[in-house]
Amino acid sequence: MNRINQLFNSNKKDILSIYFCAGTPTLDGTADVIRTLEKHGVSMIEVGIPFSDPMADGIVIQNAATQALRNGMSLKLLFEQLRDIRKDVKIPLVLMGYLNPIMQFGFENFCRKCVECGIDGVIIPDLPFRDYQEHYRIIAERYNICLLYTSDAADE
């Protein structure tokens, strides 16, 4: 059972999930932000993958993504920063990002890197459920990646 299922099946009354955009406030601080959030009682962390056209996000996340990209954050760098995170971080980690940068990275390569870094789940808000079922499900399942869906993507 992965850490997300363990968390939601636990008897924990209050679950606090926090989102932040990788590469903010500084390029090299992503792992430190995760460690600090866990230390202060966060139950699960959603790490945003910055993208130049975050159409489903509000202005705050759009600005964070812009700053992260200006700082030099990329998916490749994010995986490098998360490579050793599981040595000391025990809470569930979820990557949240748009399909375009994931496809540029290569969907199977993305799944492989998620496993190598101990990522528990992935949210891709612009991936329609039907496309997932037809093209990506078999790859995600091969790597035991838990894809979490937004209602809009699931309804398309």
Language model segments and positions:
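Conserved small/polar residues in nucleotide/adenosyl-binding loops
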Residues: 149-156
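Active-site beta->alpha loop and helix N-cap motifs at the rims of alpha/beta catalytic domains
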Residues: 65-123
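Short, well-ordered coil/turn segments that N-cap beta-strands
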Residues: 12-16, 41-43, 89-92, 119-120, ...
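Glycine-rich, proline-tolerant flexible connector loops at the mouths of alpha/beta enzymes
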Residues: 46-73, 129
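N-terminal amphipathic alpha-helix/helix-capping segment at the start of soluble metabolic enzymes
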Residues: 1-17
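Active-site-adjacent beta->alpha loops and helix N-cap segments on the catalytic face
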Residues: 2, 56-58, 73-80, 103-105, ...
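Alpha/beta enzyme core
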Residues: 30-53, 105-121, 127-128, 133
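Active-site mouth loops of central-metabolism enzymes
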Residues: 17-28, 94-106, 148
